[in-house]
Amino acid sequence: MSLKIEIIKDKILSDNYFVLRNITYDLTRKNGEVIRHKREVYDRGNGATILLYNREKQSVVLIRQFRVATWVNGNPDGRLIETCAGLLDNDAPEVCIRKEAIEETGFAVGEVKKLFELYMSPGGVTELVYFFIAEYTDAQRANAGGGVEDEDIDVLEIPFEQALEMIKTGEIQDGKALILLQYLQISGLMA
């Protein structure tokens, strides 16, 4: 028997930049018991992320940018080392991530490989993130990167082993980066 869900109330609390909803629903459990829940759900749309890697140089491209949510949560300068990422808006995931790669890292990558789709915070955020990797070369640099006009992004080309060490030391705290770096490690692509 699958779970039965009945929406009792769905109220929009904010529709400023993204949509924050307060949803009251009844959930009928497998044993027939009905439980009422009240949850806030943040709908920011779906996104995509990519890790660029170079086997010959044994390097990866990451970015560093200010993230207000991390600053609010105690990150002293609010800057986070991440993989290149962006919201899909109305684009297909691969189209989105190619645009983001050029805007944020400056690299116009060739073949991109979709790995998987993951919910990163399913308890309250609707976002489904599409994960990609792509090999890059210096010849693919189209511009300096750094993002669009309202972004202040540092492009970081880092030795792969150093990036893995940065996870251990806590310098990399972004879940997307951790997942993609560890994928690259276990896949053997950098061996």
Curated annotation (Swiss-Prot):
One Pfam short name: NUDIX
Cofactor: Mg(2+)
Alphabetical list of SUPFAM superfamilies matching this protein: Nudix
Binding site for Mg(2+) 2: E100, E104, E151
InterPro entries to which the protein is assigned, alphabetical: NDP_pyrophosphatase (IPR004385), NUDIX_hydrolase-like_dom_sf (IPR015797), NUDIX_hydrolase_dom (IPR000086)
Entry keywords, A to Z: Hydrolase, Magnesium, Metal-binding
Quaternary structure and interacting proteins, as annotated: Homodimer.
Role according to the record: Nucleoside diphosphate sugar hydrolase that hydrolyzes GDP-mannose as its preferred substrate, yielding GMP and mannose-1-phosphate.
Swiss-Prot/TrEMBL domain comment: In the dimer, the N-terminal domains are swapped between the two monomers, such that residues of both chains contribute to the active site.
Protein name: GDP-mannose pyrophosphatase
Organism the protein comes from: Enterobacter sp. (strain 638)
